[in-house]
Amino acid sequence: IADWILGTHLVFEPQNHIRFEEDVRKELQISPIDLHIHSNFSDDGYYDVEDLFAQAQKAGIRTISITDHNCARANTIARRMSALYDIRYIPGIEIDCMYQERRVRVLGYYIDEKNELFNSVESESLKREKRASLERARKLKEHTGMVVDMEKLLENNRFQMVTGQEIARVIFSNEVYRQFPIVQKYLKDEDEEKAISRFAEDLFGQGGPCHVEMRYPALEDILEIVHLAEGIAVLSSWNCDHFGEAFISSLIARGFDGIEVFSPLVSGETMARVVKIAKGEKLF
């Protein structure tokens, strides 16, 4: 994908019958790039847009893309920062969706971030997260009798997301609830941080009594949005360690233009499988 984006390729001088003092094979320099960055417009991002450009400049990265979760807002700021820091910028986004009852993510590159469709993507994401947060609290009350003030937790919550871990922390900070048997059984055997994590996993994790199943837009709808916004759709490597080759091939057939291969979050074995698919399908 780097060669395609930058238009670079390796060049070797032909081995003619000409005598040189030394081997003069040359190759064009390929600039470092990072096309999967999250800013603080994502719930898992820490840095604002300018901080990311400053860090990229310091690291010698020449091309970046900020692909926030279900949000295209960073791109407008990033375009201004691009000129200021002399770093090439490719507008991007990463959108959650569903395919065959499994959650996948679509990376959109070269998008027109001003397209109104992305406002809808973000709005629906915030509504979805708020509904899920309230449902977690409702199930907790039903299962344990413990009540969490969700209005307070959501009041200044930028992403309208209150996780099971955050709810567990509120419960463990309440002196009355700490005396409940369901909380005591976690406190008596472990230190507090481990107790909170295990409580959250047991109650809100997959199969737990307070677990909330999330539903996302259909993959086909998200691919259409990216293409209508003049972008290219790339399958994110997120969770690909758990996707079989047949499933990935089926995904690609729905209309992807490319696939993310290299990521520190996936195994070498997965990268090898994905490279094979990308070459076979002639993907970016």
Whereabouts are the PLM-identified features?
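Secondary-structure boundary/capping signal
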Residues: 86-89, 148, 179
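An N-terminal domain-start capping segment
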Residues: 1-8, 137-152, 192-200
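Active-site phosphate-binding/coordination module
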Residues: 77, 94-130
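Alpha-helix capping at helix-to-loop junctions
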Residues: 114, 142-146, 177
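Conserved acidic, metal-coordinating active-site core of Asp-based
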Residues: 161-231
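An N-terminally biased module of ancient metal coordination in phosphate/nucleic-acid-related enzymes
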Residues: 1-102, 203-282
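Alpha-helical scaffold segments that flank or form the walls of functional sites
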Residues: 50-64, 80, 116-122, 126-141
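Conserved phosphoryl-transfer catalytic core
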Residues: 127-164
